[in-house]
UniProtKB/Swiss-Prot annotation:
Keywords: Cell membrane, Cytokinin signaling pathway, Kinase, Membrane, Phosphoprotein, Repeat, Transferase, Transmembrane, Transmembrane helix, Two-component regulatory system. Highly expressed in young leaves and spikelets, and at lower levels in roots, mature leaves and stems. SUPFAM superfamilies: ATPase domain of HSP90 chaperone/DNA topoisomerase II/histidine kinase, CheY-like, Homodimeric domain of signal transducing histidine kinase. GO terms for cellular component: nucleus; plasma membrane. PROSITE patterns: CHASE, HIS_KIN, RESPONSE_REGULATORY. It comes from Oryza sativa subsp. japonica (Rice). InterPro entries: 2C_system_His_kinase, CHASE_dom, CHASE_sf, CheY-like_superfamily, HATPase_C_sf, His_kinase_dom, HisK_dim/P_dom, HisK_dim/P_sf. This is Probable histidine kinase 4. Activation probably requires a transfer of a phosphate group between a His in the transmitter domain and an Asp of the receiver domain. One of its GO terms (molecular function) is phosphorelay sensor kinase activity. It catalyses: ATP + protein L-histidine = ADP + protein N-phospho-L-histidine.
Length: 1005
């Protein structure tokens, strides 16, 4: 019912969680739609703003480029206009100079010194000074009264510009001197034309040069005629018009080729290809006349520049208009710069958008992660509850089975019945072990494993692990050995259970896959070890020659200097390296470190089948094995190594391996533990520390072993018992060593004769059964030895050959461990074991006063057992009664409350956790509440201090009985007021450790 109810509650919570999640999902979708709309609007607005910025910058840069082009146009146009004016002024000055020449040599000389030929020659020779004039001529002023005499004097009649006789006029201006280039105008009256007449009259009235309107010259170029008055005398600038007319002698004129003038000018300047230059006569603004350039109207498209020219004639107006030949193109800067800014804006916008999107995504992810976290926490709680329930519900019936089998084995059984019961017990323990492994993996995944920190004896733990596999190793005939460096502290602080679990998993795997050779467990300090602590997981294939598994030859025994003579997977694990390590540890001074941390390097080496190359990458993957045949042939689930790796990492270490198919494997891991001071050891009651017997101190032994690694391991175990030893390789030098002759020396045991002779079984020859006994008797009779040494045979296998040997006092079975070796030596040497060093059946030492015995703790104690399972009640009651306790059982928490009303008779309560109606947690809370109330009443009571002192001590030790191995359950036990817990089924050692705190003699007293 409890499980079903829990499932219903879990379903309701799941439905509520789904509903909340649905609401959150709906809100999330609505927010997503709003966010998409806002993002779209923001993106469009940013693009439009960037485009507007591009347009503004483009307009500004284009205007700047146009303004710069206009300024350049103004500069170039004004430069050309000034140069044109300057050159025109120079030409006018030359005409003026020629007019002065005529006035000087024609009118001031009598007779005149100037004639046509002279004028023509002079004009031709000085024409280089007037490159812009196509020709010059001088016309004399002739009044009508003087016409006739003038014509007689010149020898020709005055003609009009049309070469017709000039009609009668007030005055005439016939050309009398001309440059040869325009000699065709000689005798023509330049005043016969209306415009020419006006220009001549204006010139003599102002005294300045005047210009005609542009016309086509004989060269087909556009040009103008410059007219300059010639006076008989020099006149001041303010001379009246009438005086100027009266003083006028004639007129000097020249034809200007304006097109040639401008062309020559433009050729002298750079940039002409870019400009179009036009020169206009704008005297009549409504009808401008082109003087140079094409006939383009003045309304020229921008940009253009107009410059007013001053040729010295105040009446006529001239302008120069400049414009670019080609249409101005948009400058690259007006395109590239705004485009670059636009790209930058878009990139910035993209970055902002990406950052904002990232922020939104992160925010959304955080929201989802928060929701997932809540779901994960809920799932974690559900998983913990599920694991607790499964652990309890699966282990409870199995514990009942194992408990009943224990009780059955305590009864009188036939041999066949006992064998059946023992077989069932082994199978049940194997199933419990498998369940524990699966639950351990689940606890690791749930993060529910916390390490203990209690003092423990590492060497004792290794001895216990070796004991577990001793029978299996003897059946297979393989060497199983342990060596712990003397530098490793005897007592360490850590989690002994988890350390034992790692070693057990690794040794168990080695036992499973090893059929010959050895399994060697070594423990060294990391500071002293140069072994494979950092070995990488990489395949080693037949000496790295690339052959596959089936190409690897099986190594033969005796060819390698290892524990058994078989080759090891890690080539560094040989006698040479082992000897160097031993020498280093022996010679090094004790190292005192400020840190209390101790880093151990533990290696488990085997000569088994190794790990195939294709499977080495998934060795630590849960439930994975090399192939499907592995489980069929060797059994197992493939979870042990995965759990070991996780535990090693939780302990702050690393695990690696080196494996070679058909050679073997070496697993190496590090573990970080702490040193333990003597006070912590003496005060601690958590772990029972079992000291080894001291009865063998001072004894010496001689060891016959041809394998130095194996001999070192044997010396290690003898040394633990205080026995010094010497090693010889074969049996022959043994007799010399025993007698101290033949140059033999006992380096390790001094001059003292060994009292025992230990011989390895593979050093025992076929005739030694007779010869050894005879030789020893002979040596005793000849007084070479005084006492016959006890002869022990060391054997790793149970064989008929060993059983038939009669010349030995005892056979010491392997694997060696100190306690078993001590027991064998006690019996063979006839040494009486002191009572304080004897152990009871449970493995606990009997104290001198018997306080260490579980039987002594429980004898006569009243214990209440609370469990809803009748089988468990029977098992618990039977176990406790076996140790002399008085047991009373109830099936519910309510019944327990009624029996535990203060005052009561019970010394201890064992409480199941999961029970219907009222579980163990709630029952414990109510018991503690009752005790607290009773203690308060006792404190307030006025009945006397003695009664108050007695009743104030009401605190019944309550221990949880649980098949649940989840850490959260243990924490809940402490939180509700329980004093500890014991696992079901009861294990004698653990039960002793749990109850001695409350029922020990120091407590009772």
């Amino acid at each position: 019912m409890g499980v079903g109810g829990g499932g219903g509650g879990g379903g309701g919570e799941a439905a509520a969680a789904v509903a909340v999640e649905g609401d959150e999902a709906g809100k999330g979708r609505r927010w997503w739609r709003v966010k998409v709309k806002l993002s779209t609007v923001a993106v469009v607005a940013w693009v439009l703003a960037s485009a507007a910025l591009w347009a503004g910058l483009h307009w500004r840069f284009r205007r700047a480029a146009l303004h710069k082009a206009e300024e350049a146009l103004v500069c170039m146009c004004e430069e050309r206009a000034r140069m044109l004016q300057d050159q025109f002024a120079v030409s006018v000055n030359h005409v003026h100079a020629l007019a002065i020449l005529v006035a000087t040599f024609h009118y001031d000389k009598h007779p005149p010194a100037l004639d046509q030929d002279t004028f023509a020659v002079y004009a031709a020779r000085t024409s280089f000074e007037r490159p812009l004039l196509s020709g010059v001529a001088y016309a004399q002023r002739v009044v009508h009264a003087d016409r006739e005499s003038f014509e007689r004097q010149q020898g020709w009649i005055i003609k009009t510009m049309k070469h017709e006789p000039s009609p009668a006029q007030d005055e005439y201006a016939p050309v009398i001197y001309s440059q040869e280039t325009i000699s065709y105008i000689e005798g023509l009256d330049v005043m016969s034309g209306e415009e020419d007449r006006e220009n001549i009259l204006r010139a003599r009235a102002t005294g300045k040069a005047v210009l005609t309107r542009p016309f086509r010259l004989m060269s087909n170029h556009l040009g103008v005629v410059l007219t300059f008055p010639v006076y008989l005398v020099d006149l001041p600038n303010d001379t009246a018009v009438e005086d100027r007319v009266a003083a006028t002698a004639g007129y000097l004129g020249g034809a200007f080729d304006v097109e040639s003038l401008v062309e020559n000018l433009l050729r002298q300047l750079a940039g002409n290809q870019e400009l179009v230059v036009n020169v206009y006569d704008v005297t009549n603004h409504s009808n401008p006349l082109v003087m140079y350039g094409s006939e383009v109207p003045l309304g020229i498209p921008s940009p253009s520049h107009t410059y007013t020219l001053d040729f010295g004639d105040p009446l006529r107006k001239h302008q120069m208009v400049c414009r670019y030949r080609n249409k101005l193109h948009v400058s690259w800067s007006a395109i590239t710069t705004p485009s670059g800014v636009f790209v930058i804006c878009m990139l910035v916008g993209y970055i902002i958008y990406a950052a904002w999107s990232r922020y939104d995504n992160v925010k959304e992810d955080c929201r989802k992660m928060e929701a997932l976290k809540k779901r994960a926490e809920a799932a974690d709680i559900a998983k913990s509850q599920f694991l607790a329930t499964v652990s309890h519900e699966i282990r409870t019936p199995m514990n009942g089975v194992l408990g009943m089998l224990d009780m059955l084995l305590d009864t009188e059984l036939k041999s066949t019945q006992r064998d059946y019961a023992q077989t069932a017990q082994v199978c049940g323990k194997a199933l419990i072990s498998l369940i524990n492994e699966v639950l351990d993996r689940a606890k690791i995944e749930a993060g529910k494993i916390d390490l203990e920190s209690v003092p423990f004896d590492l060497r004792s733990i290794l001895d216990d692990v070796i004991s577990l596999f001793s029978s299996k190793s003897r059946e297979k005939g393989i060497e199983l050995a342990v060596y712990v460096s003397e530098r490793v502290p005897e007592i360490l602080l850590g989690d002994p259970g988890r350390f034992r679990q790692i070693i057990t998993n690794l040794v168990g795997n080695s036992i499973k896959f090893t059929e010959r050779g050895h399994i060697f467990v070594q423990v060294h300090l990391a500071d002293h070890s140069n072994l494979a602590t950092e070995a990488k997981i990489e395949p080693v294939v037949n000496g790295m020659n690339g052959h596959k598994d089936e190409a690897i030859a099986i190594p033969t025994s005796g060819s390698h200097n290892t524990l058994s003579g078989f080759e090891a997977a890690d080539s560094r694990n040989n006698w040479e390296n082992f000897k160097l390590l031993l020498s280093y540890e022996k010679n090094e001074m004790p190292y005192e470190s400020d840190s209390d941390k101790v880093t151990l390097v533990v290696s488990v080496e085997d000569t088994g089948i190794g790990i195939p190359l294709h499977a080495q990458g998934r060795v630590f993957t849960p439930f994975m094995q090399a192939d499907s045949s592995t489980s069929r042939n060797y059994g197992g689930t493939g979870i042990g190594l995965s759990i070991s790796k996780c535990l090693v990492e939780i302990m702050g270490g690393q695990i690696n391996f080196v494996s070679r198919p058909l050679v073997g494997s070496t697993f190496t891991f590090t573990a970080v533990l702490r040193r333990c001071d003597k006070n912590a050891i003496s005060d601690s009651k958590t772990v029972a520390l079992h000291p080894l017997p001291s009865s063998f101190k001072g004894l010496s032994a001689l060891l016959v072993d041809k394998r130095p690694v194996r001999a070192t391991v044997t010396k290690y175990h003898l040394q633990r018992l205080g026995i010094t030893s010497e090693v010889v390789g074969t049996i022959d030098p043994t007799f010399g060593v025993l007698s101290g002759r033949n140059g033999s020396s006992l380096t390790s045991i001094g001059k003292k004769q060994p009292c025992m002779l230990l011989i390895e079984s593979d050093s025992w020859g076929p005739q030694m059964d007779v010869s050894l006994h005879a030789r020893l008797q002979e040596m005793k009779q000849s007084d070479r030895i005084h006492v016959l040494p006890k002869v022990f045979l060391l054997s790793a296998a149970e064989s008929d050959k060993v059983k038939k040997i009669h010349a030995v006092d005892s056979v010491i079975p392997k694997p060696l461990k100190a306690s078993a070796l001590a027991a064998c030596l006690f019996q063979a040497l006839g040494i009486t074991q002191p009572s304080h060093e004897k152990r009871d059946d449970s493995g606990s030492l009997h104290g001198r006063d018997g306080s260490g015995s579980l039987h002594g703790l429980l004898l006569g104690k009243n214990i209440l057992v609370v469990d809803d399972n009748k089988v468990n009640l029977r098992v618990a009651a039977g176990t406790l009664k076996k140790y002399g306790a008085k047991v009373e059982c109830v099936e519910s928490g309510k019944d327990a409350l009624s029996l535990l009303q203060v005052p009561h008779k019970f010394d201890l309560c064992l409480m199941d956790i999961q029970m219907p109606e009222m579980d163990g947690f709630e029952a414990t809370r109510q018991i503690r509440a009752m005790e607290g109330k009773a203690n308060e009443q006792a404190d307030d009571s006025e009945s006397g201090s003695e009664i108050a002192a007695k009743t104030a001590k009401w605190h019944l030790p309550i221990l949880a009985m649980t098949a649940d191995v989840i850490q959260a359950t243990h924490e809940e036990c402490t939180k509700c007021g329980m004093d500890g817990y014991v696992s079901k089924p009861f294990e004698e050692k653990q039960l002793f450790q749990a109850v001695q705190k409350f029922l020990g003699p120091c407590v009772s007293s």
